[in-house]
Design a protein with these regions (language model features):
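Cytochrome P450 core scaffold surrounding the K-helix E-X-X-R motif
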Residues: 51-57, 132
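Short, Lys/Arg- and Gly-enriched loop/turn segments at beta-strand edges
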Residues: 128-138
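Short, P/G- and charge-enriched loop/turn segments at secondary-structure junctions
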Residues: 88-94, 137-143, 149
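Glycine-rich beta-strand-centered segment in the early N-terminal region that forms part
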Residues: 30-46, 60-130
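Basic/polar N-terminal segments that are highly enriched at the extreme N-terminus
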Residues: 1-10, 15
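A structural motif shared across PLP-dependent enzymes of the aminotransferase-like
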Residues: 129-131, 144-152
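Short N-terminal binding/cap micro-motifs at the start of the first secondary-structure element
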Residues: 18-23, 50-51
Length: 152
């Protein structure tokens, strides 16, 4: 049975590139509303993926040339937010990370069959998306868009 969806949720915000000090635990984040073709998932479990760490430390920025073990704890000084996501689009802060998740669909947007509400789902964290002139770029949950380190 699906309970009423609250207006606010708990989430972990990534406030910038760097070490773990850039992560902020918050309980005042608005619950997202699904748009057309989207679903809202109540997160049951979320795992830490290397994408979450690499996004936090800024390793995807084209200016970073060192290995991840060089800046893995504190991040990289040469990060450029303009290209620091998996796909190379500008990084937007704050960002809710969390590339891997499973949960239950609790709401659907326009064009999605309402019978999906209540279904358990495992989220594919990497989607193909058109970015600039590259038609098959990787769009990653928790990097290009908010992810699963939240209740919804």
């Amino acid at each position: 049975m699906i309970k009423e969806i609250p207006e606010k949720m708990t989430a972990v915000y990534l406030t910038g590139h760097g070490g773990i000090e850039t992560l902020e635990y918050r309980d005042d984040i608005p619950v997202p509303v699904p748009g057309a073709g989207e679903v809202l998932i109540k997160v049951s479990a979320a795992g830490v993926n290397n994408t979450d760490i690499n996004t936090r430390i800024g390793w995807y920025s084209k200016k970073v040339v060192d290995a991840t073990n060089t800046g893995g704890a504190e991040g990289f000084a040469e990060v450029d937010d303009a290209d620091a996501t998996w796909s190379g689009v500008a990084m937007q802060f704050p960002r809710i990370q969390g590339a891997d998740c499973c949960g239950i669909i609790v709401a659907v947007g326009e064009g999605v069959d309402e019978s999906r509400v209540g279904q358990r789902v495992l989220v594919r964290n990497m989607l193909r998306s058109y970015v600039d002139y590259r038609p098959y770029e990787c769009w990653t949950l928790g990097s290009e868009c908010d992810g699963a380190f939240a209740q919804y």
